[in-house]
UniProtKB/Swiss-Prot annotation:
Keyword match Plastid: no
The protein's name: Ubiquitin carboxyl-terminal hydrolase 17-like protein B
Organism this protein belongs to: Mus musculus
Keyword Ligase applies: no
Phylogenetic classification of the source organism: Eukaryota, Metazoa, Chordata, Craniata, Vertebrata
This enzyme's EC code(s): 3.4.19.12
């Protein structure tokens, strides 16, 4: 189960900025696309970078974050398809609709020098005209977009699971294995994530930091593990592995710490291409390749000062530095030498996606600046059901075999256990592994409390045979 946070709503009265005008030749292309009823977008096509963004006052952090999201291939594909706005019944203040308008304006108006102002529907609930942490804004934006999707899904199908395009694109699962040193019993818990914070305090590369997340952590003394089999705290070892890899991988280099956001300013190398297969709990088949497409950079002593910008890879394969209104070309060598804060990788299969179907007549609508204002007073009532297969019921925990339980079965088991116990997840204390990221990320290897009883985690026990 994915735990989504609640955030203050943006002011629905705020209207998004007007779009730049189309040139005559571009308008002709739009006419042809509308006639065909299909708008093609491929990251292999000569698609240039998005517009520069105005700095409205200490807003470089959100500009850099928005540029990284705008140039995320699977997210851009989904936004340009206009799928969400066609089923959204409450476009006023909807973060998905606001992001959809932002991405559409930015990517469909890419003449040199084009500049747009980020919609206040996207920024007003977070931005208070002072410098903030770009990573925090990223997570805030993704969670509010996720919640907007859930509202549409709940209205169309109240029994659907808490899944959304945001978690389909950015979401993955950790598998935590804990082995009791006393009875040798093993338990597994599965935790969702949208990004992976990396401890860089003692590493020189991102690969080393990823390897460190897999190192076994010894749970002993006051931090001993409560073993459900032994029914008391016992020494144990804990290891983390990726159970399910996301389409888009966000790696957060933990540069900031403490309430003042003091920065760890050290050079950490990162590759243009990354294979995640070695970090999977059940690696099968060939490599799992990822390609770097965006790098978010911070210059300064703390997260509350200095300057943010980013480098992004456009659809035609060229790199650009996006620094507020300035959009300048750069090469991959300079990109790999940046002092990165957040790295964005996309599975190469998703990088080479084909075209997007767009209904006939939608091209003019999304390019019309009045469309943005019209949406705020318009409610659409067509709904498309969103259902998920929850899987077949499983046997009770006492009858489980020693064979590892699947993730789908684990979800059902957890729901049955919660129903029997009458528990509510919001009343269960969360461990640091499940709590939202604080500044600079969290240490995923830090463990407190009884991990068998994690809220939001799916716990699967693997009993062992004992001699009489």
């Amino acid at each position: 189960m994915v735990v989504a946070l609640s955030f203050p709503e943006a002011d629905p009265a705020m209207s998004p900025p007007s779009a730049p005008e189309l040139h005559q030749d571009e308008a002709q292309v739009v006419e042809e696309l509308a006639a065909n009823g299909k708008h093609s977008l491929s990251w292999e096509s000569p698609q240039g970078p998005g517009c520069g963004l105005q700095n409205t006052g200490n807003s470089c952090y959100l500009n850099a974050a928005l540029q990284c999201l705008t140039h995320t291939p699977p997210l851009a594909d989904y936004m340009l398809s206009q799928e969400h706005s066609q089923t959204c019944c409450s476009p006023e203040g909807c973060k998905m609709c606001a992001m959809e308008a932002h991405v559409t304006q930015s990517l469909l108006h890419t003449h040199s020098g084009d500049v747009m102002k980020p919609s206040q529907n996207l920024t007003s609930a977070f931005h208070k005209r002072k410098q903030e942490d770009a990573h925090e804004f990223l997570m805030f934006t993704l969670e509010t977009m996720h919640e907007s999707c859930l509202q549409v899904h709940r209205q169309s199908e109240p029994t659907s699971e808490d899944s959304s395009p945001i978690h389909d694109i950015f979401g993955g699962w950790w598998r935590s294995q804990i082995k009791c040193h006393h009875c040798q019993g093993t338990s597994y818990s599965y935790d969702p994530f949208l990004d992976i914070p990396l401890d860089i305090s003692s590493v020189q590369s991102v690969k080393q930091a990823l390897q460190d997340t897999e190192k076994a952590e010894e749970l002993c003394g006051e931090n001993s593990y409560y073993c459900g089999r032994c029914r008391q705290k016992k020494p144990a070892s804990k290891t983390l592995k990726l159970y399910s890899a996301p389409k888009v991988l966000m790696l957060v280099l933990k540069r900031f710490s403490g309430s003042m956001g003091k920065k760890l300013d050290r050079k950490v190398s990162y590759p243009e291409f990354l294979d995640l297969k070695p970090y999977l709990s059940q690696p099968t088949g060939g490599p799992l390749p990822y390609a770097l497409y965006a790098v978010l950079v911070h210059e300064g002593a703390t997260c509350h000062s200095g300057h943010y910008f980013c480098c992004v890879k456009a659809g035609h394969g060229k790199w650009y530095k996006m620094d507020d209104t300035k959009v300048t070309s750069c090469d991959v060598t300079s990109v790999l030498n940046e002092n990165a804060y957040v790295l964005f990788y996309v599975q190469q299969n998703d990088l080479k996606k084909g075209s997007i179907n767009m209904p006939e007549g939608r091209i003019h609508e999304v390019l019309d600046a009045k469309y943005q204002l019209k949406k705020s007073g318009e409610k659409k009532h067509n709904k498309s059901p969103c259902t998920e297969d929850a899987g077949e019921p499983c046997e009770n925990r006492e009858k489980r075999s020693s064979k590892e339980t699947s993730l789908g079965e684990g979800k059902v088991l957890q729901e049955q256990d919660h129903q029997k116990a009458g528990q509510k997840q919001e009343n269960t204390k969360l461990t640091p592994q499940e709590q939202n990221h604080e500044k600079g990320g969290q240490n995923l290897r830090n463990t407190e409390g009884e991990l068998d009883r994690l809220s939001g985690a799916i716990v699967v026990y693997q009993p062992i045979c004992t001699a009489n």
